[in-house]
Amino acid sequence: MQTLSTPSTTATEFDTVIHRRPTRSVRVGDIWIGSRHPVVVQSMINEDTLDIDGSVAAIRRLHEIGCEIVRVTVPSLGHAKAVGDIKKKLQDTYRDVPLVADVHHNGMKIALEVAKHVDKVRINPGLYVFEKPDPNRQGYTPEEFERIGKQIRDTLEPLVTSLREQDKAMRIGVNHGSLAERMLFTYGDTPEGMVESALEFLRLCEEMDFRNLVISMKASRAPVMMAAYRLMAKRMDDLGMDYPLHLGVTEAGDGDYGRIKSTVGIGTLLAEGIGDTIRVSLTEAPENEIPVCYSILQALGLRKTMVEYVACPSCGRTLFNLEEVLHKVRAATNHLVGLDIAVMGCIVNGPGEMADADYGYVGKTPGTIALYRGRDEIKRVPEEQGVEELINLIKADGRWVEPEPIA
């Protein structure tokens, strides 16, 4: 079965193909973000950027398992300079990996330094020009808005100039928890405030003829995050803007719930055609984020990077230990990227429900299983020979490759 359906040109109400929102292409190193390219997987290392060797090792670990863009934190000028050493060591000992630098409080000098060394700079509009909260303030006048807007432009312009001259990119990364005080006074702690915060910086960048931009609207609550991205996409469409969106639920936590929370937010938006690059943020080792990203993309048919297994949940009709057999089949075949393999417990629903699979393993009678190629039954074999005979069938079709040896 081919889960990556050929895109159709006309969306229908019940279309099974995801029609991505058209967005421009933005280059980050050798990776392109935008609707004409696969949805990109990102993560962020935990290491202190001053630890050159540790950071290089962490970036390499992520990249080797499929992380296409890696973010590092740069809280000081010293950290920003260290990124140059990290980039060089990666190039000398491994390969050039697309890097993003995270810049926050009063970050102009830091951003200007790190822009020399990375492929994209992420700034937070709520913190880039920090407004110290005033407990006595009742609101902002138009004159104050204009003054702060000029201050933002003056602070942003050197970075925009640097990135534009180097043909590098910027992410305008809004966080729900760090909106500027004037946005909170004007729009409240709302998706509208998040969107206006991003649009303010977008307009400034466009005034400076800089459009290598990616936008994110992250929040720790999935409903807030989804509302912000939907509104951002609508506002950009209304304004004729086509910037790619970086999706993520920030501070999602760990374990099953962290994964579910991220999948709900990211997967829902992707299913609506919104989103061009994703990060699943877990309070775990960053390496644990990557399989979740690829699983979301595969489940939606947006990227196929693993075997697609179809298996029933088991019931009283099941003629063998379904869970055990599925594990055996997976262990033997999970390196055959691109295949769809079904493991079904009985003949009642098995053939119909697995009809789109490339190969099927179905309980036929007690102690006997049937092997299928597509919809066609090929042979019946004793259960104990089932996995071996499945492999032989795949080999006979010329679709088998030997697994890579474990290092």
Swiss-Prot record:
GO terms for molecular function: 4 iron, 4 sulfur cluster binding; 4-hydroxy-3-methylbut-2-en-1-yl diphosphate synthase activity (ferredoxin); iron ion binding. Binds 1 [4Fe-4S] cluster. Pfam families: GcpE. Its cofactor is [4Fe-4S] cluster. Signal peptide: none annotated. Belongs to the IspG family. This is 4-hydroxy-3-methylbut-2-en-1-yl diphosphate synthase (ferredoxin). It comes from Synechococcus elongatus (strain ATCC 33912 / PCC 7942 / FACHB-805).
